[in-house]
Amino acid sequence: IRLAGTKPFDEFAEAKALGITTKPVIIGAFTLLKLLRYVGKKQATDYADAVIAAYAGLLEKFAAAGAEWVQFDEPYLVHDLTREDIALFETLYQGILAKKGSGKVLLQTYFGDVRDCYGNITALAFDGIGLDFLEGRKTKELVEANGFPQDKVLFAGLVNGKNIWKNHYGKTLEVIDALKAKNIDVVLNTSCSLLHVPYTLKNETKLPEKYTEHFAFAEEKLQELAELKKLADVEYKLDAAFLENASLFATRPDCRNNVVQERVAAIREEDFTRLPVFKEREAIQKKEFALPVFPTTTIGSFPQTADVKKNRTARRKGEISEEAYVEFNKKKIAEWVQIQEEIGLDVLVHGEFERNDMVEYFGEQLRGYLFTEKAWVQSYGTRCVKPPVIWGDVSREKPMTVDWSVYAQSLTKKPMKGMLTGPVTILNWSFPREDISLKESTYQI
């Protein structure tokens, strides 16, 4: 393992030429080794010396280029760690930090807390340590119980980098006050990269302000950090910005549905037990479907070809009638039912030609959801998604998939699967509420 290429150094130099001294962000040595796959009998410890040399060389190059800080992201530290994991982490950074010279190194963690290694982290020669105070359930407790080194800077992740809601200044400033009372040198930070939220709220022009005034996308979160910095240095409780923020959390329009609340409250443990028992269900199913020992089927969604997308876009823009839209999809379903029968599949699917996205489609069928125009986020690679927003209590007013499945079943004597995205996936692929628990939101869905 060695340094290859010059991309991070070129980008740093490009920004510096524009008068901007950036903080390079690199995936950390420990997380890198834990996520690699090894061949044969090789293991992470076999590459420790090479990785130490590579990362030390990286720090040397950034220092020569004029970088004041270099950030190493170590999200793997929030996992359950073994003693061997902690020993590897210490070995790596004892070696790397010994070569850091005059430059400053920030260790950044996110998506959890570092309860298994807090003492090990703070004992090493990092200049700054970034901790997630939102998803890190024990982060505040760890700092309060163990203290924080006076020779280091705490980068406190207090603005949510994963969700689109405005920060609750009152709660955030309480944490900042507690840290300042311990004479901890604090830098306000997001809980993680802003990669997970849309770019800016400026592009959202159709949603009413009564909703959007509760949102903060990436640009707005940067503004929140700046505003929180100012508030943290004054008697903020009578400050206009603080009071305006507090008023947002006093009201939340169109949010509560009493029927949904009552239904969720009535859920009992026995509701999660399927009846009849598995053996009885299995016997009934075998008799009903008469499938072979190894039946064949597909996941369910077939290619969203250009004509399928064109049909959906035309419907959304009002260029075609609902009847024309449905008729097009029915022809597609019929075409692919025939293909599946000719191939000889045993359990068929209708192809999901009506679905723009496996989550957004269902959100559009449910009350309690909001939909943005341009709030895109990266899913993977070049693929982006536009997650729906769970605004209020979620309910279903009518069947979501029945008509399509009934039509598809009418075309064949073979079993036709009905397909729905499950509630956990729908929740995790949406921007969830923060005023109720994820458990309650899941139960509602």
Describe each region flagged by the PLM.
Residues 1-445:
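Domain-level signal for soluble alpha/beta catalytic cores
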